[in-house]
Amino acid sequence: MEIPSTSSEMTYFSVKCAICYKAGHGQHFGVETCRACAAFFRRTVVLNRKYKCTRKSGKCKIGSDETKDVMCKFCRFKKCIDLGMTTENVRTDQVINLNVEPSTSQSLVRLEMTSLQPETDDSNRVQYQIIHPRTRGPAILIDVNAIIKRSKTILETHFFPDDDVIVELNPLEKMTFCLRKLRSKQSWNPNFFTKINFLDLFEFWESQMEDTATWLMYSGEFRKLPNHEKIAIFKIVWAVWRRLERYTMTAQVFGQKCYDEQILLHSHQDAARFTDYDVDYSYITDQGFEKINGLFGGKMIQYFDIIVKPYLELELSDTEIAYILCQIVWNYAGRRLQGQTQAAGERFLEVISNNLHKYYEDKSGNRKRAEDKQNYVARLAKMMQIVNQMLNAQLKMENTMDVAMLFNTFNIVFTEPEFFRV
């Protein structure tokens, strides 16, 4: 039996930007801010901008009625610094050296960058060459905001062109509908590559981020959350969502061959065999492919046993894959973020569990045999085993990445590391 949506409606709260007091958009650089103030701070740091107080006092009241239309850039940035907005708060301190003197009108942020940096503000630019303050060698700063621009747009909209199609569907059916819609783009005759530059993988990831954002927005419970909460969830779940979706999609396309030859679809058009391709890491590390593959390669291969093998044995349906995705995403987000994310997740998972029960009942038709119920219970247990193994593998992957970053294995840093902990 489904839970009536009106019986346990939840109200979620939003936060205000600590800088300008407008609607907040989550934590950026260590402080709850709106998107505009976060982008302003990022541009100031990355582009080495210098400001002077418009009133020459350095004491403009940012966020007050008198400054709500036009904010003094110097005082706005000074307030960012005073409230604790630093790149250190997002774990980019291993690359960026911030020196601030907020008390004078000549204050500026000095970001050590190479001579190759352009003077213009290119909001679509992803990579910046900088000097690593620990190793003093060249390093790459990846601006995550440029990568997730379209994903954020998806997360902030409340309109879908197929609203009239899904209005009669229950929550699990909506998630399944979206999964099928996204997978309709998949080529069943993909190109196989044997070599790829690590930075080229971002093109795959950007597309998969958009798919993740689109899929999440088909959850009514997710859509009711404030924007900053949706972004926070998206940041940490896109990678684990991508992993399950790509491995199960590969198994659907290639069948047993996927498991036997260790094939993975990296995008809707591209695939590779783990035994017959390598990634060029030379641009971001001097460790070499063999060492990096030894560190992470085995952890990726394990998913053929965790995901592909049971998928083939159970012949999982799209509905069951959508259910597993929901379980992984909301359990993982709830553990990491807790609070209203955890509450929303518990509510949503309870509803889709009832939806899955109805799905199995509909498959049985008029049959109410005990063996049918026993089969579905055993099937559900194996599906939840996939969920638990995925969550455990995710934790180990995070620990490996943390160690790699601690010992400066990569000379690459992200403006928002949460996106790429895995």
Curated annotation (Swiss-Prot):
PROSITE patterns attached to this UniProt entry: NR_LBD, NUCLEAR_REC_DBD_1, NUCLEAR_REC_DBD_2
Chief place where the protein resides: nucleus
SUPFAM superfamilies for this protein: Glucocorticoid receptor-like (DNA-binding domain), Nuclear receptor ligand-binding domain
Any one annotated GO CC term: nucleus
Domain spans labelled NR LBD: 161-422
Keywords on record: DNA-binding, Metal-binding, Nucleus, Receptor, Transcription, Transcription regulation, Zinc, Zinc-finger
DNA-binding region boundaries: 14-92
Nucleus among keywords: yes
Zinc finger NR C4-type: from-to: 17-37, 53-80
A GO MF term: DNA-binding transcription factor activity
UniProt keyword Transcription regulation, yes or no: yes
Pfam family, one: Hormone_recep
Annotated SMART domains: HOLI, ZnF_C4
CDD domains reported for this sequence: NR_DBD_HNF4A
Cysteine disulfide partners in this protein: none
InterPro entries: C.elegans_Orphan_NR, HNF4-like_DBD, NHR-like_dom_sf, Nucl_hrmn_rcpt_lig-bd, Znf_hrmn_rcpt, Znf_NHR/GATA
Biological function: Orphan nuclear receptor.
Family: Belongs to the nuclear hormone receptor family.
Protein name, as recorded: Nuclear hormone receptor family member nhr-54
Taxon lineage: Eukaryota, Metazoa, Ecdysozoa, Nematoda, Chromadorea
